[in-house]
Amino acid sequence: MDKIIRFELNSRMCNFFRKYKIDYRINPNVKIPKEILKYLKRGIVKRKDKFAKGCWTYKYNRQFALTYSIDDAIGNEASNSEIFISAQNDDLSVSRTIKIALTYVYALSELMKQYRNEFSIILSYEYIRCGTEPSYGFDIRFHQIRGNDSYLVKNLEVYNKHNGILVLNILNTSKSEIQTINSPHIST
């Protein structure tokens, strides 16, 4: 049973993953723009990934691997990427998976302070079924936004988890308000 957390973030954040040795897989079939590739080329390991057919991987440990792919759905500019964290250890509990994932989120939120007025964040918890085994995870999407509506993450915390609903606080520093995002109900 895999537990998957998906990040969508601006290419300039790729340096963060290399600096802190967080792994990622790179799909060789995806055309990576030069401005993004320069952040990644020193971390690419040309080795087949046994967990994801057709992907190359840079391994960090036995429990986690990250998948990197380019999202160019908006216009012709591939300014965002998707990074998938997949827990390969079946013994990892849902709560522990979330705890580990939030560690990355806290670190990313600290990094985001360097890019004031450039990113927003959307989080949700999701129930995933792969074959006959249920999988748990939550989406963490960092969106690059422009103009006066942009804001950065100052504080991020889980303040309630009840009946499979994960609720997170996001402090919008531009508008000085809390945004609360409720996940769909998780039924096992």
State where each predicted segment sits.
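A structural detector for beta-sheet-dominated domains
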Residues: 10, 33, 86, 124, ...
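Polyanion-binding interface signature
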Residues: 85-95
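A generic structural signal for short, solvent-exposed coil/turn residues
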Residues: 77, 115, 132-134
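Intrinsically disordered, low-complexity boundary segments flanking structured domains
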Residues: 109-110, 127-129
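Short, hydrophobic/π-rich interface segment
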Residues: 93-120
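Polybasic, proline/glycine-rich intrinsically disordered low-complexity segments
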Residues: 129-188
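N-terminal leader/targeting segments
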Residues: 1-86
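A short glycine-rich, hydrophobically flanked beta-strand micro-motif that places a catalytic Asp/Glu
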Residues: 120-128
